Amino acid sequence: MQTLDPVDAASLRDDVPAFRPGDTLKVHVKVVEGARSRIQVFQGVVIARAGGGVRETFTIRKVSFGVGVERIFPVHSPSIDHIEVVTRGDVRRAKLYYLRSLRGKAAKIKEKRETPVG
């Protein structure tokens, strides 16, 4: 057991949904402007997950007004209000950096089909 494990365990969130690269997420982020605080939603495709434990991060990419925007979030950050999984993507890679060079429909990710139970 490592020395920092008990300290790290106290900082871990338990409300993080299961998501993978290729999934489309809505990340609700707490933004503080002066004395006011509000929630801002950042929706995009997960192109990478990195690290582990308390230091785990994920990168989300979206196209806003024709410009690609990427943002890296720590999974267990207190500034994240909550995370919603919008759609599940069907991809074969862990890092989807190739999406940066694709435009329009070519950058679209196939949606994973849920198999019916029963």
Curated annotation (Swiss-Prot):
**GO annotations of cellular component type:** cytosolic large ribosomal subunit
Q: Name one GO molecular function term.
A: structural constituent of ribosome
The alphabetical list of record keywords is: Ribonucleoprotein, Ribosomal protein
What the entry lists under Pfam families is as follows: Ribosomal_L19
Stored InterPro entries:
Ribosomal_bL19, Ribosomal_bL19_CS, Ribosomal_bL19_sf, Translation_prot_SH3-like_sf
One GO term under biological process is: translation
Q: Does the keyword Ligase apply?
A: no
- State its role: This protein is located at the 30S-50S ribosomal subunit interface and may play a role in the structure and function of the aminoacyl-tRNA binding site.
The UniProt family comment states:
Belongs to the bacterial ribosomal protein bL19 family.
Under the heading PANTHER family, the entry gives: LARGE RIBOSOMAL SUBUNIT PROTEIN BL19M, RIBOSOMAL PROTEIN L19
Q: What is this protein called?
A: Large ribosomal subunit protein bL19
User: What species is this protein from?
Assistant: Beutenbergia cavernae (strain ATCC BAA-8 / DSM 12333 / CCUG 43141 / JCM 11478 / NBRC 16432 / NCIMB 13614 / HKI 0122)
Q: What is the lineage of its organism?
A: Bacteria, Bacillati, Actinomycetota, Actinomycetes, Micrococcales
